[in-house]
Structure formats: C-alpha cells, structure tokens
UniProtKB/Swiss-Prot annotation:
InterPro entries documented for this protein: Ribosomal_uL5, Ribosomal_uL5_bac-type, Ribosomal_uL5_C, Ribosomal_uL5_CS, Ribosomal_uL5_dom_sf, Ribosomal_uL5_N
Protein's name in the database: Large ribosomal subunit protein uL5
UniProt keyword annotations, A-Z: Ribonucleoprotein, Ribosomal protein, RNA-binding, rRNA-binding, tRNA-binding
Family of this protein: Belongs to the universal ribosomal protein uL5 family.
Gene3D superfamilies: 3.30.1440.10
Pfam families: Ribosomal_L5 (PF00281), Ribosomal_L5_C (PF00673)
GN (gene name): rplE
Molecular-function annotations in GO: rRNA binding; structural constituent of ribosome; tRNA binding
Entry GO CC: ribonucleoprotein complex; ribosome
PANTHER family the record matches: 60S RIBOSOMAL PROTEIN L11-RELATED (PTHR11994)
One BP annotation, GO: translation
Tree of life domain: Bacteria
Function: This is one of the proteins that bind and probably mediate the attachment of the 5S RNA into the large ribosomal subunit, where it forms part of the central protuberance. In the 70S ribosome it contacts protein S13 of the 30S subunit (bridge B1b), connecting the 2 subunits; this bridge is implicated in subunit movement. Contacts the P site tRNA; the 5S rRNA and some of its associated proteins might help stabilize positioning of ribosome-bound tRNAs.
Length: 185
C-alpha cells in the first residue's frame, strides 16, 4: 500500500491562518490576490574557491543536506584578474526550493535555525527589495541540525532569498510575519 504524503506544517498554516489574516488586513477581492511564498533561493558563495576548487562541491553537499535537494555548483561568468578568478571556475553553490520542500525549509529556518544563530536580535525589516522579496544572510551554516558539527572542516555563510507574489514590501512583511519570521521592532 502506498504511503500517504504528509502536508508540511507551514503549508497547512498558510492555508488555514495566513490567508485569512492577510485577507482581513488588506481586503482582497479575490483569493488569488493574496500573496504567497513563491520560492526560496539559498546561495553559498565560497571565497576560498580560487585556492581550492573542491570547496564548492563540499558546500554543495552541505547545502543538499540542509535543503533535501541537490545543489548546483555555480561558476564564474567572466574572468576577474584582481580576484584571480577565471571564467567557468567553480565559486559556490545554490538551491532553488519550491512547493513542499520550500515550506519544510521555511519551517526549519524559523523554528530551529534562526533561534540557534549566535547573538540573534531579529531579522532586519528593511531587507525587502521593493517588489516584495526578502533577503537575509546567515554567517554560519552549522545552525541547521542536518549539519554534523564534528564533521565540518570549514564554516560558511549563506544568503537566503524568500521570493513572494506580494506587490509591495508591506504585504510581504505581513506575509512573513504571519509565518512567524522574527523581525526586529
């Protein structure tokens, strides 16, 4: 017998709580106008990649463990002599999450990873791009429980971009606040 697929907690939270909250606050005429999280892009830029070309693939493995999806090694688009970078040289890794994996990552980010960040005082509410997308950085990838601290040879940071269908930053801020993102007041 096929096993029943479990719906991610944040997805259920979105459909049962977040949509109603946003509908009441912004008075949308149609349910399709209610903003939603479209995708999450996680990027790791490895500065030491110029010295050791194996580091981006190690970062891609770690990113794969964190997200549950295979990461893509990113390469330099053009050569920059100042940074000793050649065209096509591996420089980092990235993952684009959508649908259920996106909601599961969002859940782990908000409930587990962010509280484990050292000296965390909340997310900057001004980190929106003007089109409803939110960008943040984490200095240590070891805050995620999937990474075994003893087996890590180097600690890397990562950029996390949450893309939403919101038209304004205020709508996106309320959407993420409804997902329990810990914004600074």
């Amino acid at each position: 017998m096929a096993e029943e697929k479990q719906t991610p907690r944040m997805k259920t939270h979105y459909f049962e709580v977040v949509r109603k909250t946003l509908q009441e606050k912004f008075n949308y005429k149609n349910v399709m106008q209610i903003p939603r999280v479209d995708k999450i892009v996680i990027n790791m830029g490895i500065g030491e990649a110029t010295a050791d070309s194996k580091k981006p693939s190690i970062a891609a493995e770690d990113l794969g463990l964190i997200t549950g999806q295979k990461a893509v090694v990113t390469r330099a688009r053009n050569s920059i002599a100042t940074f000793k970078v050649r065209e096509g040289m591996p420089l980092g890794a990235k993952v684009t999450l959508r649908k259920d994996r996106m909601f599961e990552f969002l859940d782990r980010l908000v409930t587990i990873a962010l509280p484990r960040v050292r000296d965390f005082r909340g997310l900057n509410p001004k980190s929106f791009d003007g089109r409803g997308n939110f960008a943040m950085g984490i200095k240590e990838h070891i805050v995620f429980p999937e990474i075994n601290y003893d087996k890590v040879d180097q600690i890397w940071g990562m950029d996390i971009i949450v893309c939403t269908t919101a038209k304004t930053d205020d709508e996106a801020r309320e959407l993420l606040r409804a997902f329990n993102f810990p914004f600074r007041s």
